[in-house]
């Protein structure tokens, strides 16, 4: 496998072409952003930790029947993945009220929800990734109803697998966001990453936040939170 030119650079990752048309290399950066890019900074070795965390979690999900774009971890910062067309939706899963949902609905952070909440945001930086529903998504051509059904079914399974896995490490999975992609044959697969950048992790005993909220809210010890998550899931 030969790494070629950069195809795309996002807030946290770079994507490179390879000598295989259907494979890409994803490089994880240390750059950190919050509030739709309004707050910017760096977290030491964040890219290394997120690459390792995502690789471990995607491998676990694959073993439990979830199709992903992940092929293998190449080194500390890079992984080899299937080339996919990203569905322009972020799927947000909320098990406990926190963050923007708590603020939007006037709920105290940490309030247990009577059911898991699934939300969509439309991936558009200029618009600030607005919340939309499935009808909006179909109306603007982001996905079909059939694709949305597949995505929601996969997301529910992913949530159950991750909640159980993290509970074993004394971590509550409060909420998270994931993305999906379409392979050349139209197959929907889990893409992007699962890491402290994209999840809220609270220690089940102390309630300590072990995720990017430490950067977002200036709580300090940001790197330590990422290290702790990697340490617990690496057992």
Swiss-Prot record:
Biological process terms in GO annotation: 'de novo' IMP biosynthetic process; cobalamin biosynthetic process
UniProt keyword annotations, A-Z: ATP-binding, Ligase, Nucleotide-binding, Purine biosynthesis
Catalytic reaction equation(s): 5-amino-1-(5-phospho-D-ribosyl)imidazole-4-carboxylate + L-aspartate + ATP = (2S)-2-[5-amino-1-(5-phospho-beta-D-ribosyl)imidazole-4-carboxamido]succinate + ADP + phosphate + 2 H(+)
Superkingdom field: Bacteria
Classification via InterPro entries: SAICAR_synt/ADE2_N, SAICAR_synt_PurC, SAICAR_synth, SAICAR_synthetase, SAICAR_synthetase_CS
Xref: HAMAP family: SAICAR_synth
Name of the protein in question: Phosphoribosylaminoimidazole-succinocarboxamide synthase
Organism: Clostridium botulinum (strain Alaska E43 / Type E3)
UniProt gene name: purC
């Amino acid at each position: 496998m030969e790494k070629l030119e950069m195809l795309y650079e996002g807030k946290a990752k770079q994507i490179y072409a390879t000598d295989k048309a259907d494979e890409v290399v994803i490089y994880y950066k240390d750059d950190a952003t919050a509030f739709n890019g309004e707050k910017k900074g760096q977290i030491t070795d964040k890219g290394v930790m997120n690459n390792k965390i995502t690789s471990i979690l995607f491998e676990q999900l694959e073993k439990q029947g979830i199709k992903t774009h992940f092929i293998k971890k190449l080194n500390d910062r890079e992984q080899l993945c299937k080339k996919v067309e990203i569905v322009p939706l972020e799927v947000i899963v909320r098990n406990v009220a926190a963050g923007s949902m708590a603020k939007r609905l006037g709920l105290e952070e940490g309030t247990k929800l009577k059911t898991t909440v699934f939300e969509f945001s439309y991936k558009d930086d200029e618009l600030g990734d607005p919340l939309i529903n499935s009808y909006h998504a179909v109306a603007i051509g982001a996905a079909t109803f059939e694709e949305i059904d597949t995505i929601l079914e996969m997301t529910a399974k992913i949530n159950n697998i991750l909640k159980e896995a993290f509970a074993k490490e004394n971590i509550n999975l409060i909420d998270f966001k994931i993305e999906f992609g379409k392979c050349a044959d139209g197959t929907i697969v889990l893409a992007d990453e699962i890491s402290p950048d994209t999840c809220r992790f609270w220690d089940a005993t102390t309630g300590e936040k072990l995720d990017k909220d430490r950067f977002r809210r200036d709580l300090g010890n940001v790197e330590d939170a990422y290290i702790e998550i990697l340490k617990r899931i690496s057992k």
